[in-house]
Regions:
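Carbohydrate-associated surface elements
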Residues: 136, 161-164
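A charged, aromatic-enriched C-terminal amphipathic alpha-helix characteristic of glycosyltransferases
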Residues: 316-320, 333-362
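Conserved donor-binding/catalytic core segment of Leloir-type glycosyltransferases
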Residues: 176-193, 199-202, 352
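A conserved catalytic-core segment of Leloir-type glycosyltransferases
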Residues: 1-47
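Nucleotide-activated donor-binding/catalytic signature segment of Leloir-type glycosyltransferases, i.e.
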Residues: 209, 215-222, 227-253
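Membrane-proximal helix-turn-helix segments that form the acceptor-binding/catalytic region
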Residues: 73-76, 80-84, 98, 110-132
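Acidic donor-binding loop of glycosyltransferase active sites
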Residues: 128, 237-242, 256-274
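A short, active-site helix/loop in glycosyltransferases that binds the activated sugar's phosphate group
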Residues: 117-157, 301
Length: 368
């Protein structure tokens, strides 16, 4: 109750609705969530979970606790258990807390904002080690501790372990690529992830080049904000659009491997540099050229450059977009559109799990 939606629906401040205007009930739900469900809707798990796990730990001692969030309530559970039993604790962040892109959209009161930041600081201070999904996010967490003038005994407290891909998704068989010059985006495209310059450039190219118009196919798999569909319509790209609401994981893997280009659009928000979506690593496993639209000095751009898996272009750089799309199109026409994809194995989940085990062993050893 109190959410203005069906029980099966989730509230996402970054993507409220495909309707033109979000309903007042949805906006109220976001306000309610931000101001009363702190740090998140799982806050009511904390007390019973601490009680249950305390009973469990008394009978079954462990060497280390690892919490992963969001939801950040998981960190609050782990923090209480760490303090109660003096067990080393690693806090793993797959997304930021108060620096997440939609934080400003939660309509927080001053009290709620201060509480979020206080809890975040307590977690960062009390954890023996803090793992983040990317370099920029890790530096932001470290700055919070530095600004609070809190000294840490562990010089390597803040570590980076990215998301990754399943090695089983990397095909050893010969892939038959799409006959069309297909540009595929997999996943939700919220309003903040609308590449307006990209649609404009594609619209210009289909007007300038009849062959390009006939060859182009835009594949969007997942939920798409209405503003994006309107942009596509405005630039007369409806004939090239292939919109697919849902595919299974295996079907998505196939689409990624068969597409000529994989489109990665980062949210055009204040924290764009730190955004490292799990989707990017799945793109790496597909071994197709990645066209990333986002900051050229961001974490995603760094990995794309390191792995030679594609190109990153700033949000509004129409000239660079047109230049690189035409380069890819020329290679496509010559049947030479490939990518080097070097050093991608370091981002396999197997290797990343090995990195996590090393951090766990270090934390446990330092407490003995």
């Amino acid at each position: 109750m109190f959410i203005g939606q069906k029980k099966s629906q989730k509230i996402n401040a970054a993507f409220l609705s495909e309707n033109e205007k979000s309903k007042y009930s949805e906006k109220f739900s976001v306000w309610l969530r931000g101001n009363f469900f702190i740090p998140d809707a799982r806050k009511f798990w904390v007390k019973p979970s601490v009680k249950y796990l305390s009973d469990y730990l008394k009978k079954n001692p462990v060497d280390i606790i690892v919490s992963s969030g969001p939801p950040h309530s998981m960190h609050l559970i782990a923090m209480q258990l760490k303090n109660k039993f003096n067990i080393p604790w690693i806090a793993d962040f797959r997304d930021p807390w108060t620096n997440i892109d939609f934080y400003q959209d939660l309509m927080l009161s001053s009290f709620a904002d201060k509480k979020h930041k206080r809890l975040e600081l307590e977690v960062l201070k009390n954890a023996n080690s803090v793992i983040s999904v990317g370099k920029t996010m890790s530096e932001e967490f470290e700055k919070i501790i530095f600004d609070a003038k809190i000294k840490s005994e562990n010089k390597n407290k803040f570590r980076v372990i990215t998301n990754g891909f399943d090695s089983d998704d990397v095909s050893s068989e010969k892939i038959i690529l799409d006959k069309k010059f297909s540009i595929a985006h997999i996943g939700t495209m919220a309003k903040s992830r609308n590449p307006k310059a990209f649609w404009k450039v594609l619209g210009e190219l289909i007007q300038e080049n009849k062959n390009f118009e006939n060859d182009l196919e835009i594949k969007l798999v997942g939920k798409i904000d209405i503003s994006i569909l309107k942009n596509i319509e405005y630039f007369k790209l409806e004939k090239q659009l292939k919109k697919i609401d849902y595919l299974s994981h295996n079907e998505i893997v196939k689409v990624q491997q068969q597409s000529q280009i994989l489109l990665l659009v980062l949210n055009n928000t204040h924290n764009a540099k730190s955004i490292l979506t799990g989707k990017m690593f799945e793109y790496l496993s597909a071994q197709r050229p990645i066209l990333c639209i986002g900051p050229k000095d961001g974490d995603a751009a760094q990995i794309i450059e390191e792995t030679q898996s594609g190109v990153t272009i700033d949000f509004e750089d129409e000239a660079a977009l047109k230049k690189n799309i035409l380069i890819y199109y020329d290679l496509y026409k010559k049947n030479q559109l490939q990518t080097a994809n070097t050093h991608i194995e370091k981002y396999s989940r197997k290797n990343l799990t090995k990195n996590l085990c090393e951090v766990m062993n270090e934390v446990v050893s330092s407490k003995k």
